[in-house]
């Protein structure tokens, strides 16, 4: 196993096309990509035929309700705005350190935007699950989508 650090959208597709067996995305990364189709297109390109994509991310419900205490709600489930906010982990630091952590920009997607992007970019959806918030189990907090690269 090798670890490569960098912007996945800048990956060398001549070198890494159909190179990866499984892409595992955990803990909220989709909102860092402003164009989900561009992101899913790259994921498809780097996966081998029949490769698996596992996306475990914050539930889009957190766009309107801060069910995970992320301090990042946008106010509208259907908002397509890109907004500036703290990185999700910043809230775990002292205020002094928290102030020094750079802000980043977000684009939060709806469930249909996520699923449709996977489908448009060559994945079949094998499983989709929603998970309760760890703050209030009556509310959705995360989801897991599992897709297979179509040959």
What residues fall within each predicted segment?
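C-terminal lobe and adjacent flexible extensions of AdoMet/dcAdoMet transferase-like proteins
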Residues: 113, 117-151
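A short glycine-rich, Lys/Arg-flanked "PGG" loop and its adjoining helix->strand segment in the class I
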Residues: 37-52
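A short acidic, Gly/Pro-enriched loop at the edge of an enzyme's catalytic core
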Residues: 9, 13-23
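Generic structural signal for helix capping and beta-alpha/helix-loop junctions
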Residues: 11-13, 63, 135
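Short loop/turn motifs at secondary-structure junctions
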Residues: 19, 49, 122-124
